[in-house]
C-alpha cells in the first residue's frame, strides 16, 4: 500500500467502526505508542464517549511512563480520558520463574487479555479496539515471535476466551503508514513520532528470568540510553539486561577475528552471554547464542571501532556460527561482577528489516559511563552489531 490515500483511509475506518459498534461501548488499551493512539483517536471520532481508554501499568513500563502517557492523551488536542490500571503484582507473578522468550510472551499475552476482560466487564464493553499492524501479523503467522496483540490470526477466538469482539483498524498498514495517518489526524509529534515500544514492555528486555533487581537496573539504563541516543534519531533504540557472561572463551573466533582485522590476538576477546536470544533464519524464528567481542588496546581499554571492518567479522560469524543470533561489541566494563547491558539502535522503515546505527564511539562511551554511575549492579555494556535479519529487533 505504497500510495495510501490517508484521508480516505481515515474516513473509511471511522465509518467502519461506526457501523460495527453502533451505540455499543468499546475499550482500548493505550500505551502512548502511535498504533494504539491512532486506533483510539479513530474510534473516538466514531463513537465519542462510548470509548473507554485504559493504560495497563504492568510494571514493565519505563520510568514515569504511566502518568506521562495519561497526561499526553488526555490533554488538548486529543482529549482522550485515560484510566490507569495498576496490575504490577499480577504481571510479576505471572512471569515469575519463566526464562524462555516465547513462554514469557505467551504468558504476558494471556494476562494482558485477562486484565482487559476484567476491565471490559466492569465497563460493560463487548468490543476491544486494538492497534495491530501488518508487521505484527506477519511476524506471528510466520513463527518468528508471538506478538501479544495477535489472537484470531493464530486461532484464538477472543469472544469465546475473553468475552469481547476485536476491532483492528490498522491491520493493513505498516508502521510508516500509521505515522502518516497520525500526522493527518494532527496527533502531536511526541506521540506520532514516538519510537516503538513492545507490548510486553521491559519484560522481554530483561532477557531470561525476570527479577525485581534486574528490572530496576534496566529501567535506569533505558532512561540513559534514550537520553543519550535520541539526538542521533534512530528508528528504535533501547537497552536490554542479561545475567552476565558464560565462563567460556571462544578461542577460534578470537583468532579468526584478529586475522580479519589484521591485529594481534592479544587485542581481541570473544565469548558469549548466558541467556539465548531470538533471531531469524530462513524466515523462521531461531533461538540461539549471543556472541560477544572486545577490541582492546595495549592497556586493556576498548578502542574506537571501524564499522566497515566490524561488518566483515559479523558476516564471518553468521556464516560460520549457525547457532548464533547476535554479535555485540564491548563498549566498557568494570572489574566488579554484575549484570551485562546491551545497547541496540537501528534504522528501519517497515520494521521487517533493519540496519544498525553506526553511532559515534564517544556517544556509546558516555552512555556506558552514565549507566555505571546509575546502575551499581551492572559491570559490562555492549553495543549490538546485528541487523534484522539475522536478529529480530527485540532480544526476545
Name each model-derived stretch.
Residues 1-396:
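ATP/NTP-dependent adenylation/nucleotidyl-transfer catalytic domains that generate, transfer
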Amino acid at each position: 500500500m505504497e500510495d495510501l490515500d490517508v484521508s480516505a483511509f481515515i474516513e473509511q475506518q471511522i465509518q467502519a467502526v461506526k457501523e460495527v459498534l453502533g451505540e455499543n461501548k468499546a475499550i482500548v488499551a493505550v500505551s502512548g505508542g502511535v498504533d494504539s493512539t491512532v486506533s483510539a483517536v479513530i474510534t473516538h471520532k466514531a463513537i465519542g464517549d462510548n470509548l473507554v481508554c485504559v493504560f495497563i501499568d504492568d510494571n514493565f513500563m519505563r520510568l514515569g511512563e504511566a502518568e506521562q502517557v495519561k497526561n499526553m492523551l488526555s490533554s488538548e488536542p486529543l482529549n482522550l480520558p485515560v484510566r490507569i490500571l495498576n496490575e504490577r503484582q499480577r504481571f510479576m507473578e505471572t512471569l515469575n520463574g519463566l526464562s524462555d522468550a516465547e513462554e514469557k510472551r505467551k504468558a504476558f499475552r494471556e494476562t494482558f487479555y485477562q486484565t482487559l476482560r476484567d476491565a471490559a466487564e466492569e465497563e460493560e464493553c463487548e468490543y476491544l479496539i486494538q492497534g495491530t499492524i501488518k508487521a505484527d501479523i506477519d511476524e506471528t503467522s510466520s513463527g518468528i515471535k508471538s506478538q501479544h496483540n495477535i489472537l484470531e490470526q493464530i486461532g484464538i477466538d477472543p469472544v469465546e476466551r475473553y468475552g469481547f469482539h476485536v476491532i483492528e483498524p490498522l491491520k493493513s498498514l505498516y508502521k510508516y503508514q500509521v505515522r502518516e495517518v497520525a500526522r493527518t489526524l494532527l496527533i502531536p509529534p511526541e506521540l506520532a513520532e514516538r519510537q516503538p515500544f513492545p507490548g510486553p514492555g521491559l519484560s522481554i528486555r530483561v532477557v531470561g528470568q525476570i527479577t525485581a533487581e534486574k528490572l530496576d537496573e534496566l529501567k535506569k539504563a533505558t532512561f540513559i540510553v534514550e537520553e543519550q541516543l535520541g539526538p542521533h534519531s534512530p528508528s528504535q533504540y533501547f537497552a536490554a539486561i542479561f545475567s552476565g557472561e558464560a565462563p567460556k572463551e571462544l578461542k577460534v573466533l578470537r583468532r579468526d577475528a584478529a586475522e580479519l582485522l589484521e591485529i594481534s590476538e592479544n587485542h581481541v576477546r570473544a565469548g558469549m552471554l548466558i541467556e539465548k536470544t531470538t533471531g531469524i533464519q530462513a524466515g523462521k524464528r531461531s533461538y540461539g547464542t549471543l556472541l560477544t567481542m572486545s577490541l582492546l588496546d595495549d592497556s586493556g581499554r576498548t578502542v574506537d571501532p571501524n564499522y566497515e571492518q566490524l561488518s566483515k567479522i559479523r558476516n564471518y560469524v553468521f556464516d560460520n556460527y549457525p547457532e548464533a543470533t547476535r554479535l555485540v561489541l564491548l563498549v566498557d566494563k568494570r572489574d566488579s561482577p554484575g549484570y551485562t547491558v546491551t545497547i541496540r539502535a537501528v534504522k528501519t522503515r517497515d520494521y521487517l528489516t533493519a540496519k544498525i546505527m553506526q553511532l559515534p564511539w564517544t556517544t556509546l562511551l558516555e552512555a556506558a559511563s552514565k549507566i555505571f554511575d546509575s546502575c551499581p549492579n551492572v559491570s559490562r555494556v555492549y553495543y549490538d552489531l546485528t541487523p534484522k535479519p539475522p536478529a529480530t529487533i527485540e532480544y526476545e
